[in-house]
Amino acid sequence: MVNVFVDGLSVEVKKGATILQACAQVGIEIPRFCYHERLSIAGNCRMCLVEVEKSPKPVASCAMPVMDNMKIFTNTPLVKKAREGVLEFLLVNHPLDCPICDQGGECDLQDLTMVYGSDRGRFHEYKRGVEDKNIGPLVKTVMTRCIHCTRCVRFATEVAGVPDLGTVGRGRDTEISTYIQKVFNSELSGNVIDLCPVGALTSKPYAFTARSWELQSTESIDVSDAIGSNIRIDVRGSEIMRILPRLNEDVNEEWISDKARFCYDGLKRQRLNNPIIKENGQYKTVTWEKAFNFILKNLQEIQNSNRIVGVVGNLMDVESILLFKELLNKLGSSKIYLESSTPILQLNDDEKEDQILNNADFRNNYISNTPLAKIEESDLCLLIGTNIRLEAPLLNTRIRKRYLQGNYSVYSVGPTNNLTYNTENLGNDISTLLEISEGRHPFCKKLMKSKKPLIIIGTHVLQRTDGTSIIELVKTLFKYTQIKTSNWNGFNILHTSASSVGALDLGIGSTKRYSEKISNSKIEKHFIYLLGADEIRIENSKEHFIVYQGHHGDYGANIADVILPGSAYTEKTATYVNVEGRVQNTKSAFYAPGNAREDWKIIRALSEVLNKKLPYDSFEDIHTRFMSIAPHLLKVNAIEKNKIVIENSLPFKGLIKNIGFKPLFNNFYLTNAICRSSQTMAKCSSIYKLN
């Protein structure tokens, strides 16, 4: 530790800390434009100048490390004069168009001009004009406002791993630009909007729609993937105007994906507002009572409870999943499947039940056991059947962050992917995994030397008919590596669905496994209840009676005989469990449109009509039930600590097909019903396909 004096206050700081960090430690905020705690130090705006004893001139506090007994002064006439001079130079070419700038009210330049700026200018020449750049459908550029802090350049290069932004020209002609008019091709591009201290980079979808002081904010989480990024929903009236990231060091730091940030316009399109039934091939809007009675009538025609099937969608909350499971159990069915692991639902005589994972009673068999914040402790990474850049962009940034620290290697088994760090592909062949498990592959030597290896298994593995066997094969590595020790667990299942871990916590762990031969016998009519399931494909769907409960008119609604309008994640207070097992809550920002209701309330009302009444009249009743079956679901923003059990790996006896892994999805922007209803996401999809 080093002792320094800031404006006469003594403070101890870590050796190597900067003057700016020392000032922050005693509560003195130093003005800055280019400095950001998550980016490398540039030191090019000079706004953070301070006076240091025995220094001939002011120094940049963001770049100067402290020394023992250093005396720092932040509020002297020299410092004020220096900051005023720097600000005057920054305003020389600034257009001063605050009334029409979307950054107004949230602009660092605006705020600091109020403190250090003058009421008149001394520059009487023509201001420099800079042509605006087209860097994609999400980020609007007004480059005349740019002050060359280079935050966007450093973010793109260091965090996003996409060096598309840079500086061109020199001196007065310096500009921030892309290479030969290329778009900024990153899943995290929207974060440069938050980083920009002026109005040079703003949101295209949000442009000219609202001012920050008109908005009401609600703290919530994102459900577009299984990371559970913390977000802030800004609303005016009953319309979402924008979504911003919320700081959570343990989950998303302060970044969010473009899908989380910009898909919100899909929440006002293709919405289901009223119950609908299909009679004689025609859809009719009806009351809730008539829709429930129509379900009861058709359910009574199903004589065998084995013909009652439920599918849990990717965006569903834990409370609704619990009631859904209990309702189907009361109807005599245990056939409840996860949409994320059952891409195709075939109903035939050759079907048989199986578990997604063996030992699903133990939580560490189906979650990512390495907390996101501890990924930086790993010293080697093996990716199996996953394109982590598309399936979990914020997990990808964590791995890239560790990669940039050095002495880190990333290997993959599966298709070759364009990740944001160097990856050695070991092949897309099951025989490669077999060689690794038997210790015959050259990679095994590196794996054995690793003290804290990280293994990440993708969702595509769970969708394979031999997925359970592949996971058990990977577990045989425990016997000669340190993947799982008394103080480290590097075994991770990467889910891509926000509902998967919560559903598995509630015991919904079965999926469909089929024999190779498909039966030609007549398919009996099934009662299929889709709870927000829009990604699943049902063979011979016209032969069955299908109930769809959800919020968008997507695939599920198109094949349904009854449509029950539910609430989106922005319209309900609900519980979700992320990929690492962390329990988090969404908060209602406004009411659902029309006659749509919260999903758990719909299931509760339906149970009464079906004479299978569920004993839950309030949210508190459901949480009381959690206390007895899964008490960890009540511990918000916490990960239930699981005792690390070192398994005695048995010889592998499973059957695995020698078929390579396939991409889970190729289009990052259209992975759920909300995104597919979003015009912004559609633009992204079409533009980035061409690039």
From Swiss-Prot:
Keywords, ordered alphabetically: 2Fe-2S, 4Fe-4S, Electron transport, Iron, Iron-sulfur, Membrane, Metal-binding, Mitochondrion, Mitochondrion inner membrane, NAD, Oxidoreductase, Respiratory chain, Translocase, Transport, Ubiquinone
Residues annotated as binding [4Fe-4S] cluster 2: C146, C149, C152, C196
Alphabetical list of Gene3D superfamilies matching this protein: 3.10.20.740, 3.30.200.210, 3.30.70.20, 3.40.50.740
Catalytic reactions of this protein: a ubiquinone + NADH + 5 H(+)(in) = a ubiquinol + NAD(+) + 4 H(+)(out)
GO MF annotation list: 2 iron, 2 sulfur cluster binding; 4 iron, 4 sulfur cluster binding; metal ion binding; NADH dehydrogenase (ubiquinone) activity
Transport among keywords: yes
Binding site for [2Fe-2S] cluster: C34, C45, C48, C62
Positions of the 4Fe-4S His(Cys)3-ligated-type domain: 78-117
Major site of localization recorded for this protein: mitochondrion
Annotated [4Fe-4S] cluster 1 binding sites: H94, C98, C101, C107
Ion transport found in the keyword field: no
Subcellular location: Mitochondrion inner membrane
All residue ranges annotated as the 2Fe-2S ferredoxin-type domain in the record: 1-78
4Fe-4S Mo/W bis-MGD-type domain location: 215-271
Cofactor: [2Fe-2S] cluster; [4Fe-4S] cluster
Top enzyme class: translocase
Catalytic activity, EC: 7.1.1.2
GO terms classed as biological process: ATP synthesis coupled electron transport
GO CC, alphabetical: mitochondrial inner membrane
Cofactor comment text: Binds 1 [2Fe-2S] cluster per subunit. Binds 2 [4Fe-4S] clusters per subunit.
Family matches, as Pfam families: Fer2_4, Fer4_NDSU1, Fer4_Nqo3, Molybdopterin, NADH-G_4Fe-4S_3, NADH_dhqG_C
Physiological role: Core subunit of the mitochondrial membrane respiratory chain NADH dehydrogenase (Complex I) that is believed to belong to the minimal assembly required for catalysis. Complex I functions in the transfer of electrons from NADH to the respiratory chain. The immediate electron acceptor for the enzyme is believed to be ubiquinone. This is the largest subunit of complex I and it is a component of the iron-sulfur (IP) fragment of the enzyme. It may form part of the active site crevice where NADH is oxidized.
Binding partners and assembly: Complex I is composed of about 30 different subunits.
UniProt family annotation: Belongs to the complex I 75 kDa subunit family.
Protein name: NADH-ubiquinone oxidoreductase 75 kDa subunit
Source species: Reclinomonas americana
Source species taxonomy: Eukaryota, Discoba, Jakobida, Histionina, Histionidae
Encoding gene (name): NAD11
